[in-house]
Amino acid sequence: MTFAGKLTKAAAFVAPLLGGASHAAPPEAIPAVVEIETPIAATAPLQGYMRAPDGAGRWPAVVLLHACNGNWRQLDQRWAKRIASWGYVTLTVDSFGPRGLKNTCTSGAPVDLAFDAYRALNFLVQQPSVDPARIAALGFSQGGWLTLTSVERGVVEQSAAHKFRAAVAFYPPCLDFKDDMTVPTLILTGELDDWTPAVECRSMVEGRDDYGISRRSGDGVPIRLIVYSGAYHAFDIPTPGALDYFGHHLEFNRQAADQSIDDVRNFLYATIGAKEPVKEQIK
């Protein structure tokens, strides 16, 4: 998987966001289109699905970022619906549709994609149902890279007016991160992942990289790495069997998937808070 290197400043954007209800049991509300900004210079509007818990108040929130194959609607159904039922506002971003992209698994992500998490964050902090001090980013594969890029001390994080308070990255590519994370960060990956190897994430977490550069002891915020035994890339996505995708092995692992639900819920509860965690499984 190829990902963009240097980052450039992203343009302003128009962001139609589809909203829905949160609880699994009641029927979902009819999605509503929300227009965020209408600058004349906008060339890549941002869109997505937004869910909110029932009831008044200001809720913690999570921005969800999809992988290099898009599928943001499936991500909303698979993870955002669940997280919203825990008591969080969720915003699942579609980075590809407005850009006319279908897949960036071999071509690499556009450089301005790295700012999409903050474009979503800037929208959420304006919502009366969101607590602006309790917003996390959660991404998968390429979206995991975007998540880590968003909270790594560097040009993206430092140029942002508002900040994330926590970050979760599922099986991200961990190469090329040379600086510290600025918020509590959780990385979840599979022991047998042959696309974004766990060993690369372990090196990053331990402050080592392939350039021989190590983070200074005591700097930044600690990163927690969880490696699921026997799990491959995309272990949380239910599929009928193993798949070969661009030469990489993808396979659902129920044990790892169920455990990741608990791990994410516990981490979010500890960092930005909502309902107290209880055991849950993938259906």
Where are these regions (language model features)?
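Bacterial N-terminal signal peptides
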Residues: 9-19
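Short beta-strand/loop motif that positions the catalytic acidic residue
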Residues: 187-189
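N-terminal cap/lid segment of alpha/beta-hydrolase-fold proteins
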Residues: 25-57
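Catalytic active-site module of serine/aspartate enzymes centered on a nucleophile-bearing elbow/loop
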Residues: 244-283
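Short substrate-entry loop that stabilizes the transition state in hydrolases
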Residues: 55-59, 64-102, 176, 194-198
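Primarily recognizes the serine-hydrolase "nucleophile elbow" in alpha/beta-hydrolase
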Residues: 73-75, 86, 117-182
